[in-house]
Structure formats: structure tokens, C-alpha cells
Amino acid sequence: MTYYHASPAGGLQVLELRKSPYFDKPTQVCLTSLRAMALFYLIRNYEYAYGYTRQGKLYFDEPFPDALKKLYAGKSGWLYTCEEGNYEKTEIPNEFVSSQPVRVLDAEYIPDAYEAFLHEQEAGNILLLDYAHFASDPEKFAKKRAWLEKAISEEIRKKAIWKAPDSDCARYYLENYPEIWEHTLEEVIFHGKPEN
């Protein structure tokens, strides 16, 4: 089996254990057996909107208009092929983790992550679902928006992101989910009451 790891950093010979600054996961090396899935991690982001169909097909579901292009166009990074090992399988399809450093076997420079996703779609390795795909179905769209509002609002509250409005994370949520940001602030700061 081939194992991949993606990073904005080049020149890595060994993947060292890391703790994600954004997700509540242990210190580890994350790997995937699916090249298209690895591409998501060419950038550091606060959310990764991919999933799998019932048939096991990887998809990217844009959480806001033009998300894939906005997040990945013009972004470069490195796709590493790693040595085989006795890696632990996670609950996420095609994801593996290692509690030990992992040796890199090969590296591929990806000059534009967005273009790489388009090539993966052409090859049939991923479904890229644009925002309009769900917006055209009112019932699915309402469910998706409700889920996003709950998840993002909880994240903003739990990590007190609203207390640092100039942070990269706060700007990300404010720029891409302005209604959710404002609604959450109203609840947190004004406890649901209008400002006097």
C-alpha cells in the first residue's frame, strides 16, 4: 500500500510527530492511502470539508461559495510518499496514523493545489461538489446550513475565538461565514439580547 502525507513545507526526509493546532488529536503523524485525500493537507486550514459517499467515493463539499478555489488556487506544497509501516487505521476512511516518526521515500512538488484537485476529478478520484449543488436543493441546503451553524458556533465558543477578532482563525470564520459569526457573537456577548 502507498502512504501519502502532504505539507506546505518542502525538503522533509522524516515526518516527525506533530500536534494539530486546529484539531483535538494526539501528537502523531497523519497519513492517507489516497492521493486525492492527501491534497487537502497541502494547506493549513481550520476545516476540511471532505467526506465519503455511501459507495466509498471521496468528495469535497464546498461549505461556502467558491471554497475550493478560494482555499487552494495558487497554493503550493509537497506530496510525500512514505515508507510502509504498521500504521494504525482511524475511523476516517483511508486515514492512518503513526506514533513514531515516518521516513519519506519520495516527494512531489504541487505548484497549484486547485489544479491538482481538478486533475484528480478528471481521473475519477474525487467528486468536487460546488456550493450551488446543495443550494439548489432547499431541504439539503437547510440541513447543511444548520449543521454548519451548529459546528462553527460551537468552535467559536469553545475556543473563545471571538475574543481575538484579529486572529487568522477569527478572520477565516468572519470572512467565510459572516452570518454565523454575527449570530454567535450576539449570543455570546449580548446573551441573545439586542445591544443597548
Predicted regions: what they are:
Residues 1-2, 25-29, 35, 75-78:
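Short, surface-exposed beta-edge/turn micro-motifs
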Residues 21-22, 29, 68-72:
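A general structural signal for short secondary-structure junctions and capping/turn motifs
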Residues 29-50:
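Short, well-structured hydrophobic secondary-structure segments
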Residues 1-26, 41-44:
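ADP-ribose/NAD+-binding catalytic cleft of ART/PARP-like enzymes
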Residues 11, 38, 87:
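Short, acidic Gly/Pro/Ser/Thr-rich loop/turn segments
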Residues 44-196:
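Conserved NAD+-utilizing ADP-ribose enzyme module
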